[in-house]
């Protein structure tokens, strides 16, 4: 998976669709490093999206990913 990919994943008993913004090893603006096999995701509608910026556990584990959109 790469930055910019749109994924479908399970998060807190919901199925969500978001875009990968940071991949394993990337450093977030606050200095946090994205863990191995994890992703930091953002919704395309940033002003209304509940995404990694707001979750207590901000990273999406690879094992929770259900699908990747292919265009």
Region spans (language model):
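Extended hydrophobic leader/signal-anchor segments used for secretion and membrane insertion
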Residues: 1-71
């Amino acid at each position: 998976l790469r930055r910019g990919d749109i994924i479908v994943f399970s998060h807190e008993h919901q199925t969500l669709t978001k875009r990968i913004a940071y991949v394993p090893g990337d450093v977030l603006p606050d200095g946090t490093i994205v863990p191995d096999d994890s992703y930091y995701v953002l919704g395309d509608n940033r002003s209304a999206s509940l995404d990694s910026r707001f979750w207590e556990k901000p990273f999406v584990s690879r094992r929770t990913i259900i699908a990747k959109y292919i265009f």
